[in-house]
Amino acid sequence: AGVAAGNGRNSKGQYRGVAPDGELIVVKLGNPGGIGFPRTAELMQAVDYIVKKAEELRMPVSINISFGNTYGSHNGTSLPERFLDAAAETGRTLISVGTGNEGAEAGHASGFLREGEERNIPLAVQERQGAFSLQIWTDYTDVIGVALQTPSGERVGPIREVMGTQRFRVGKTELLL
């Protein structure tokens, strides 16, 4: 908020935001409650609220989304990406999305598999990491199997594809699918 609309009062005018006379609409998504799933529905509701409020006030709006996730297809076709594109075309709306600060953590992998081919994809999960989310994107008609192997060598899977939530434990780790 200070970078956007800081008025410089605490620094005797030396440090001010880019729009010190700007007005802010701040929307907090709330506590995720440890469920570990993407909260894109709440994000879309928040953006919708801001765009509608700006239209009501007849003001332009610049929305900064620092959401801290790597979900989605990353090719502009996922529901949240298409929603943000549409929102940016509404009224006088500008949307900025952070590009991440994961550095060299190898949070993404991509590739193609031929029928019958297997591939191991190592995941870097910290020892005390409380939650971890993984998305696998395939073409609609593809059928894949997923198995997990812990650092201790315990293996789970292939995991069956079923509708609804699946919960199970591997050692001390709870998996929520």
Stretches with model-predicted labels:
Residues A1-R39, R58-S62, T90-R92, G130-F132, ...:
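Subtilisin-like serine protease catalytic core
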Residues G2, A41, Q45-D48, K52, ...:
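Solvent-exposed, polar/charged alpha-helical surfaces in well-ordered, non-transmembrane soluble domains
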Residues A5-N10, Q45-A46, G116-E118, E127-Q129:
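Short amphipathic alpha-helical surface micro-motifs
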Residues L24, Q45, P151-E154:
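Amphipathic alpha-helical scaffolding segments
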Residues V27-L29, V47-N75, G98-T99:
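Short acidic, glycine-rich surface-loop motifs adjacent to enzyme active sites
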Residues F37-M44, H74-S78:
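Soluble non-cytosolic domains of exported or imported proteins
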